[in-house]
Amino acid sequence: MTAAHKQKAKLLAWLKLILWGDSISQRIFHFYIYCILLGAVLLFLPFALKTDYQKVISYEVDLQGHTISKQTASYGFLDALFLAVSAFSDTGLSTTVVSETYSVFGQTVLAILLQLGGIGFVVIAFLVWRLFKLHKKGKYSFYEKLMLQSERGGSKLGTTSEMIVVSVLFLFMVELLYGFLYTILFYFIPAFESASVFQSSGKVSNQLKALIVDSTKRLPVVHNLNLAFQYGFFHSLSAVNNAGIDLLGANSFAPYRTNWGIVIQWLAISQIIFGGIGYPVLFDAYEAIKKRRLYGKYYKHQFSLFTKLAVLTNLIVTAWCFLMLLMVEFIVITSLTNTIAHLNVEKAYLVEGLKNKSNQELQSLIFGPIPAASRVMQLWFGVISSRSAGFSVFPWSAESDIIKGIMVIAMFIGGSPSSTAGGIRTTTLAVIFLTLKAKFRGQKEVKVFKRSIDGQTVINAFLVAVFGLVSVVLIAILLPLSMQQPLSFVDSLFETTSAFGTVGLSSGATKIMALEPTRNLFNYLTLGLLMIMGQVGVSSSVLTFVKKHPQGNSFSYPREDVKVG
C-alpha cells in the first residue's frame, strides 16, 4: 500500500471515528447528538414559533387575569438547541414559556424528542426494524442485543430484546390510557391562571415574591375539547418519560395544586414511577405475573437483585426526602408555612385585592382550602417529581434554602438505570452504602440478598458518584460568573443538579440566562452537557471517550501499597 493510500485510509478512519464512533457507547452518543441537532433545527424553523423569532421568558397576571408584565427577548438557535437537549434528555429546563413561544408544530417536535429520548432512540429504531423487517424466528444479532443492553437493557443479554418489547408496550399503553384520562380532567376541572401575591416592586424577599394564588381567568384548556386532547396526550408523554415539559403556562402544574387538581397530581405521580423505575423492574414484574398465572398461586417468583435494590432504594430515598421536608416545613421557624402565618409589615406590599386578607385567608388562597393537607400533598408531589420528572405545583424559588438542599440530594440520586430517569441512579447509591457497610463490618465482600457484588461494580459505583458530584459542584461554582443578576450558590447548585438529574425543576437561573444568551453561552453549553450526561449515564458518558484498545493493558508492574486517608 502506497503512502497516499495509507494517508487516505487513516483519514477515513478518523472521519468514521468522529462521525460514527468506534465503540457501542460512542455510537449511541453520536445518535443522540444527531437527534438533538435535528430537533434544534426543526425548533428554529419560523413555523415552529408563534411569533417572529421572539420568545416569552415569563409573564405575570393580576387577580383578574390581565397580563401586567411579559418578559420577552429575541429567539436564537441557542434557545432551540438548549430546549432540544432538554427535551431529548427528558429534563424540562427551558429558557422560554413553551405554551407561549411554540406553535403546534413546535410542540409536536418537542413531543417526538421527549419520546425518542425517554423510550430510547436505539430501542425505538429496534422496534421499528422489528415491525417492518421480521427476523427469522425472532433472532437478533449479538451486536444488536449489545446496543439495546447498553441503552436500556438489564444484566442478562439473552432476555434483552424480550424485555425491551414488554416494557415499551406497557409504557405505550400507559401513555394512551392516561392521555384519555388527562383529556377528560383538563376539560372538566376548573383551573385558573396563577397570579402573584406580592407586588413585583415591593420590598419583600424573593421567596415571598414568588408566591402565587389563583386569578379569576380560566385556563384556555377548560371546556375546550381540542386543547384538552392536545394537552392530555402531551402531558401523558411528558410524565411517562419523566420530561417535565408542560403546556400549562409559566407555573407548570400550579393551577392544579388544590381541589380536583390533586387527581391530576396522582396520575402524574403514577406515570413518573412507571417511567423511572427501570425496564428490568417492569419486565421482572411482568415475568412474576405471567408465571404466577401459569403455575398457580403457589409459585414464588425470584426477583432479580437489580429489582430488589432499585425498588428498595427508591422507597427509602423517597420516604427519607419526604419526612425531611415535612420536618422542615412544620417545625423549622423559617419555613414557608410559618413565614406566611406571621406576616406583618410585608402586608403593605400585597397586590390589590389581598391587602385586607388575614394570614389564615392568605394561607388558604396560596395552599388550598385545607392549607396543611394541601401543603403536604404539594411536598409529596415535589419529592416524586424531583426524582427525575420536573413538574411542579409550587414555585421552587419560593422555597427555603434548606428545602432546596434536600431536593438537591433527591435530584442528584435520580431514578433507576435503564429508565427514563437521570442522576447517579438508585442502584449506584445502594452499592455505595452496601460497600461502606461491608467495610465497617470488616467483610471482604459486598453482600446483599444472598448475593455478592462484583468488585468492578463497586469501583464503577464510586466513579459515577464522584464524577457526577465533581461535575455538578464545579459547574455550580462557575454558573453565576456570567449572570447579569445575582445568583446564590444554593440556587446555582439546584439548577445544575436539576440538569444532571434530568429533572427540570428550576430556581430561576435558566430564566436569567435567557435574557442574554450570547453572554451566557458557557452556561447554555455546560447545562446542556450535564443534561446529556444525566440522560446517557455517567458510566456511558465516560466510556464514550475511553479508548477501545488502550496501551498498557498487556502487562502489569509489581504492586506496592500506598497509605491513604
Swiss-Prot record:
The lineage of its organism: Bacteria, Bacillati, Mycoplasmatota, Mycoplasmoidales, Mycoplasmoidaceae. Keywords: Cell membrane, Ion transport, Membrane, Transmembrane, Transmembrane helix, Transport. Its main location: membrane. GO terms for molecular function: monoatomic cation transmembrane transporter activity. Belongs to the TrkH potassium transport family. One of its GO terms (biological process) is metal ion transport. It is a multi-pass membrane protein. The keyword Repressor does not apply. It is found in: Cell membrane. This is Uncharacterized cation transporter MG322 homolog. The keyword Mitochondrion does not apply. The chain crosses the membrane at residues 28-48, 73-93, 109-129, 169-189, 262-282, 315-335, 364-384, 393-413, 461-481, 526-546. GO terms for cellular component: plasma membrane.
